[in-house]
From Swiss-Prot:
This is Protein IMPACT-A. Residues 14-116 form the RWD domain. It is found in: Cytoplasm. InterPro entries: Impact, Impact_N, Impact_N_sf, Ribosomal_Su5_D2-typ_SF, RWD_dom, UBQ-conjugating_enzyme/RWD. Residues 308-318 have a biased composition (Basic and acidic residues). Interacts with GCN1; prevents the interaction of GCN1 with EIF2AK4/GCN2 and inhibits EIF2AK4/GCN2 kinase activity. Interaction with RPL39; this interaction occurs in a GCN1-independent manner. Associates with ribosomes; this interaction occurs in a GCN1-independent manner. Associates with actin; this interaction occurs in a GCN1-independent manner. CDD domains: RWD_IMPACT. The gene is impact-A.
Amino acid sequence: MADTEEENLQSQIDEVEALTSIYGDEWCVIDEAERIFCITVSDSSNKPTWTLCLQVILPAEYPASSPPLYQLNAPWLRGEDRLTLANNLEEIYLQNLGENILYQWVEKIREFLLGKSQTSDPGPCLKSTSEETDVDDDCEIPAEELNESFKNSMLFGLNDSSGVEEIPPIIHGETITDRRSTFQAHLAPVVSPYQVKLILNKLYENKKIATATHNIYAYRIYIKERNSFIQDCEDDGETAAGKRMLHLMQILDARDVMVVVSRWYGGILLGPDRFKHINNCARNILMEHKYCSAGEESSKQTAKSKKVGKECKKKADH
């Protein structure tokens, strides 16, 4: 066993040296001790249209008996594109069991991006990702930045020996309709980042949800041993909506839960009201299913106290 781990480590070192030689500064070492790396891949070295960041952790079992743990990050990567690319990477692993595959993964991603650049789609940096834009959304993904949530989630995955995980039950909330736009929340309990992928895949099996204009999501998983959270969010083209929803979940201290809000755009711009509807959908389903702790009640009580204080002051003034 020890010999195998040593062989794996040496194989990883050789592979990383080769990748550094091939890709130069594009290949970034995030944490050498934890074997965490990332690379930004694009469709062109001159004026890239499509860009994606591949982040990986190399477990002790790689390459002999385990694939790299990975995450694909890009503002435009969603739905069918994400599933297609993930399936391509999995296929490469299955066809090359026991071998180093990172170079093949990087080049498969580049091939995928080149394919998209050759279509009629102008690309994410040349078009608005939403029919309503209030906040600038940067198309560049800084390869050197790896947030703590990703590191926590990947390390959590390394230590998780629960085996095959089941798809958690998914609950669908009531719809909110405003000027022909419809919003609906979906909620599921989660205890690992892998379950997040299972839930998304399951939701996308529903044609109505899969064809929604946006599927915004956020999740929070509490890691008791570390007294910390694995948390992440996705705007899915509705700029800053995912961050707003995650912030709401933090205020509510929602734990071990994922919320997806689908929006079907009806052709009439809603402006800031769309964020209100997205968060209301999320809040309603979280409160209905008891995922809110004292945080919400505390904020309500504070607001109530302020209101009472103002009323008392008015009476005193009179």
